[in-house]
Amino acid sequence: MRRAASLVALGLLVAAAPSRTAAPGVHVEMTWMSIANWYFQIGGLRIVMDGYITRVPEKIFVPSRQYPNDRYTFTTQPWKPNVADVRRVRDAISSDGRLDFVLAGHSHFDHTYDVATWALLTGARIIGSQSTCYQAQAQGVPASQCTVVSGSWVTGHGERIDLGHGVTLRVVRFNHSGDASNPYQHFGRELKMPPHAVNGGLRAGVAEDFPNGGGSRGYLFTVDNPGGRKLSFFVNDSASAFDLTKPVTADGLSYGSPLANLAAAMRDAGLTSVDAWIATGSAGLASMIVPVIHPKVYIPNHWDGFFNSMWRGLPFPFSDKNLSSYLSAHGIRLVPQTQYFDLYQLDAVGVSLQPNLAVKQKLGFTHAQAFAPATHAAVKAFEATVPPDDCQE
């Protein structure tokens, strides 16, 4: 019998019974906050995913001598989170500063560096890997405020969590981008204990305080919609076609392959397709995942680099000819971003891109980023020589 882990003691009710009903005319608002950072608002439910607003500078990273493709293995010094910037974003997206959950896709610095800050500023519950919870503890978040999830449906440890407001979350164990040439980044790695307090757990290297957390976690959302069909979307912040069909392993334990876990979560949700897929990766990766989830809309994320200052706005336009061609051939609508804090609205009709002008104005962003023809040309030239990867844009 497949396990739906009981998380009642940690303040989460696993949805063995039907979820509470959402208000009529329900819709999902999904705001892109750069990289793989999202703010989801579903009725009264408010969720941040990843929420990496601090920018740890590239200059402090040292690559592995043995694996030079592992460019972010070590650092020369700890780096403090930018609490003021996180607070600024919080105040712009939420009028009362309230947040219910912080989801962590995986535990690398460009995803979880600010998770503890979000939790401390808002009281939100963290959901993620054991590494994410240890990272948060090192920064002062009580262990009781963080829920460790597996997402291993094929071993009977796939979580189905009732978030309230008619929203059910299914956790899906996934892999991380890369391959055997950058094993520290790619293969599953977990912290064994909270990072040492002497540096606050703030050594950003993937072989230091921020390993990937045993691969990554994708999140499959379903939203009750009284009087209409159920809404659904799947979001993943990293993936690799290299071993998508092979089991994710960490510390000698197997968690099943990403594709098998995703297929099992889809069956558990009673879904044959999703309204939207928030994703990262190439046409090759999409060709493996699309047959499992059959998305109506593809929304890219983690394509804009992670060392650029967020406050300058989108650094370059989205461009992936091969992915665009694949999606078009399969009738999947591609809706790329035009600026940070673009807002997508999902409802019974589909997905629409909303201006979100009030939030952008609070943060100093234009409605849509303007790019010179030379920038477009440079992006296309670069695209022709380098395959897309969420850690090597």
Protein language model regions, located:
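Binuclear metal-ion centers of metallo-dependent hydrolases, dominated by the metallo-beta-lactamase
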Residues: 133, 137-163, 291-393
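Active-site-proximal loop/helix segments of hydrolase catalytic cores
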Residues: 202-293
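Active-site environment of divalent metal-dependent phosphoester hydrolases
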Residues: 36, 56, 108-112, 133-136, ...
